[in-house]
């Protein structure tokens, strides 16, 4: 894979981010505030998914295994 193309792709993604969030027309302190808020939201979503998705998968597995007639469940 060509590293120049990868660099150009990330530059394009960053440009798209600036256009979508209107960061291109903001002052630097406004950009940093918006970036902090977005980073906080993304971090919270990733953490919540990391914590709660395995629990829901286990509960769904137990629910459907009881419906299908399997008596064994995942041991804790």
Swiss-Prot record:
Disulfide bonds: none annotated. GO terms for molecular function: serine C-palmitoyltransferase activity. Keywords: Endoplasmic reticulum, Lipid metabolism, Membrane, Sphingolipid metabolism, Transmembrane, Transmembrane helix. Induction: While expression is androgen independent in the hpg mouse prostate, it appears to be androgen-dependent in the kidney and brain of normal intact mouse suggesting tissue specific regulation by androgens. The keyword Lipid metabolism applies. Its main location: endoplasmic reticulum. InterPro entries: Ser_palmitoyltrfase_ssu-like (IPR024512). One of its GO terms (biological process) is endoplasmic reticulum organization. It is found in: Endoplasmic reticulum membrane. Signal peptide: none annotated. PANTHER family: SERINE PALMITOYLTRANSFERASE SMALL SUBUNIT B. Component of the serine palmitoyltransferase multisubunit enzyme (SPT) that catalyzes the initial and rate-limiting step in sphingolipid biosynthesis by condensing L-serine and activated acyl-CoA (most commonly palmitoyl-CoA) to form long-chain bases. The SPT complex is composed of SPTLC1, SPTLC2 or SPTLC3 and SPTSSA or SPTSSB. Within this complex, the heterodimer consisting of SPTLC1 and SPTLC2/SPTLC3 forms the catalytic core. Within the SPT complex, SPTSSB stimulates the catalytic activity and plays a role in substrate specificity. This is Serine palmitoyltransferase small subunit B. It comes from Mus musculus. The gene is Sptssb.
């Amino acid at each position: 894979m060509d590293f120049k193309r990868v660099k150009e792709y990330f530059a394009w993604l960053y440009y798209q981010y600036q256009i979508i969030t209107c960061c291109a027309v903001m002052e630097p302190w406004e950009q940093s505030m918006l970036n902090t808020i977005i980073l906080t939201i993304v971090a919270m979503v990733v953490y919540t998914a990391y914590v709660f998705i395995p629990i829901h998968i286990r509960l769904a597995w137990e629910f459907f295994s009881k419906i299908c007639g399997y008596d064994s469940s995942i041991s804790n």
